[in-house]
């Protein structure tokens, strides 16, 4: 562990190191709070919110601690559940605020990790990188598992760096209980405990205990959980709508990292090379984590930006390692900050799907039969047919047939660019789905359309009368 030197305080020049962190946390939290109400009362920021928040709410309203669903472990649901107890229905806003708090804790954890490894100024660089990275900013507003996983990973890495191997094992278990890829933290744990195999064995046992204590039904219903986890992994490996024409996985995920970090990624790459050359304990822990985590992404064809999120604090640490260029790195953070502010500004608008929902409620009689694309607001009081999301390798949804819909008495169809733009961009992979959109537009009357503009954010939405 690198000892803190008096010179580190002089290097900061930010009004004192203990003032810089609170100021950074206040600014980062403020940035994340803007747009936190986007799409409410519907989970339009991320469809996974619909899988997590209602289950957390149900846990404090009589359903018990078993979620009955294991695409993710249960720690995040358990964390959210107490804050749902006073609500009469699932509160996406409350859940998002809890995740914002976890995101702020992750920024502080990045500071702590790098302060212990490379000094105070490097810690500020890592914390600022985490605070500003577009991916971290965006997912801190979403009541999903990615920011909690990143927090757990950062705390685990920090404990490894300072040699608290057993406590690091507990943190590994908690990170894995937030999201299954946390198990990859066992690789840097091996590096941190190299030659101390008894301590590693204890840490591994503590990791299992921490996981079992916070996701007990994954253990108790292991068959169901293993099946759900394997299905999620297969889906990620097979790809997802929108990534059909992407670059190969190594290039695609570097692009996702660039989208989050901008030119700071170059500084982090140089820091990674230096870490591999010098190989201090901190260097090895960070380098092993980054390399092993990135390597496992190579098997994935669904190139979601959230998959690189746990790398952000570690890459910020490696960028901060180059203390001699820290002022330049801080200036380079202006690029992702500009991107984050731009994205945040869009979240101050009304989502187009909310506007379409209001139009339907005001103009379509209750009880009417409506077919809708995924990721659209609930239409209470209507008889709704939910169209399935087209995906690589999945069978064609028979409801994506205009004649069939008409034959079943469905008179309205809601299409959204969040789905159909991706279908049309990969029409060679989805010829029948493309024909469905074109036939619906030819044979139906467009009674409402809303586009993203100065008033509205989100995808275009069309309501067609069949």
Q: What would you call each of these model-derived segments?
A:
Residues 26, 89, 93-118, 155:
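Transmembrane-helix motifs of polytopic, lipid-linked glycan transferases
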Residues 21-22, 204-209, 317-342:
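Signature aromatic-anchored transmembrane alpha helix within multi-pass, membrane-resident enzymes
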Residues 37, 41, 76, 217-219, ...:
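Catalytic lumenal/periplasmic loop and adjoining terminal transmembrane helix
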Residues 138-148, 304-305:
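Short acidic/glycine- and proline-prone juxtamembrane loop motifs at membrane-interface regions
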Residues 105, 109, 129, 148-171, ...:
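Specific aromatic-rich, kink-prone transmembrane helix
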Residues 5, 9, 159-167, 184-208, ...:
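Perimembrane helix-loop-helix junctions
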């Amino acid at each position: 562990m690198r000892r803190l030197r008096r010179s580190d305080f002089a290097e900061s020049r930010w009004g004192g190191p203990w003032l810089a962190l609170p100021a950074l946390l206040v600014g980062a939290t403020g940035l994340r709070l803007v747009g936190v109400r986007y799409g409410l009362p519907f989970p339009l920021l991320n469809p996974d919110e619909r899988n997590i928040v209602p289950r957390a709410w149900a846990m404090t309203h009589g359903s018990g601690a078993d979620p009955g669903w294991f695409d993710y472990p249960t720690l995040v649901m358990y964390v959210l559940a107490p804050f749902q107890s006073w609500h009469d229905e699932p509160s996406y806003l409350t859940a998002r605020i809890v995740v914002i708090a976890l995101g702020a804790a992750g920024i502080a954890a990045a500071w702590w990790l790098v302060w212990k490894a490379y000094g105070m100024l490097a810690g500020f660089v890592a914390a600022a990188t985490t605070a500003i990275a577009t991916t971290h900013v965006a997912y801190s507003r979403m009541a999903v598992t990615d920011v909690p996983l990143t927090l757990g990973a950062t705390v685990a890495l920090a404990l490894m760096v300072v040699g608290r191997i057993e406590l690091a094992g507990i943190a590994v278990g908690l990170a894995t209980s937030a999201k299954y890829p946390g198990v990859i933290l066992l690789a840097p744990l091996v590096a941190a405990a190299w030659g101390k195999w008894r301590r590693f064995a204890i840490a591994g046992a503590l990791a299992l205990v921490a996981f079992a204590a916070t996701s007990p039904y994954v253990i108790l219903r292991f068959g169901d959980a293993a099946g759900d986890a394997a299905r999620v992994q297969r889906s990620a490996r097979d790809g997802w709508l929108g990534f059909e024409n992407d670059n190969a996985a190594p290039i695609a995920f570097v692009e996702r990292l660039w989208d989050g970090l901008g030119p700071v990624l170059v500084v982090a790459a140089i820091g990674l090379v230096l870490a591999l050359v010098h190989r201090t304990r901190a260097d090895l822990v960070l380098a092993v984590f980054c390399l092993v985590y990135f390597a496992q992404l190579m098997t994935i064809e669904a190139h979601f930006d959230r998959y690189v999120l746990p790398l952000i604090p570690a890459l910020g640490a490696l960028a901060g390692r180059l203390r001699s260029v820290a002022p330049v790195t801080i200036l380079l953070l202006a690029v992702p900050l500009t991107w984050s502010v731009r994205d945040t500004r869009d979240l101050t608008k009304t989502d187009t799907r909310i506007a379409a929902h209001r139009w339907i409620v005001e103009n379509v009689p209750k009880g009417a039969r409506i077919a809708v694309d995924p990721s659209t607001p609930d239409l209470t009081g209507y008889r709704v047919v939910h169209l399935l999301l087209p995906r690589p390798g999945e069978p064609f949804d028979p409801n994506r047939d205009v004649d069939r819909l008409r034959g079943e008495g469905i008179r309205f169809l809601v299409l959204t660019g969040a789905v159909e733009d991706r279908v049309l961009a990969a029409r060679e992979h989805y010829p029948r789905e493309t024909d469905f959109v074109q036939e619906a537009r030819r044979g139906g009357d467009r009674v409402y359309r809303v586009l993203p503009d100065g008033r509205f954010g989100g995808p275009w939405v069309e309501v067609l009368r069949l």
